[in-house]
A protein has these predicted regions:
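Helix-coil boundary/capping segments in enzymes
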Residues: 1-140
Length: 140
């Protein structure tokens, strides 16, 4: 079995929230395939479930574990909402095809009480496979 455990997904909800809270960070565009977020001068298409299934079938991948790029550089009051809406969007993808997609949760590490609550929610209610923890949060 081939498992891709480092697969970033970019839910449209995540792009829209970034634009709302941090308009200097992302530019949103529409193209023939849908929403594209331009982040650090890199165009990133919003998640397309059917296109992703075609991609992993072509690559011979059996399961992908989805996560979002770490948003820990923005550890302000919006982090809990960004994590929750991103986790909810990724969970919706996993529900569409639970044998092919699993998820790692993002947690608002700037608020440990909320991080623990979101971890419990994603593991217990959304049935995520784990959580994302990077080497630093907010430069620490």
């Amino acid at each position: 079995m081939k498992i891709d455990f480092h697969c970033h997904s970019f839910p449209a909800e995540f792009f829209r929230a970034l634009k709302r809270y941090y308009p200097d960070v992302i530019e949103l565009r529409e193209d023939a395939k849908g929403l594209v977020g331009v982040w650090a001068k890199t165009p990133l298409p919003a998640w397309d479930h059917d296109a992703r299934l075609e991609d992993i079938d072509r690559a011979g991948v059996d399961v992908e574990i989805l996560s979002n790029p770490p948003i820990y550089s923005r550890v302000d009051e919006h982090a809990p909402e960004l994590c929750r809406l991103t986790n909810d969007a990724i969970a919706a993808t996993c529900r569409r095809d639970p044998k092919r997609f699993k998820a790692f949760a993002h947690l608002p590490f700037n608020n440990m009480d909320l991080a623990l609550k979101e971890m419990a929610r994603t593991l217990d209610e959304l049935h995520f496979a784990g959580v994302v923890v990077t080497s630093n949060v907010g430069g620490r």
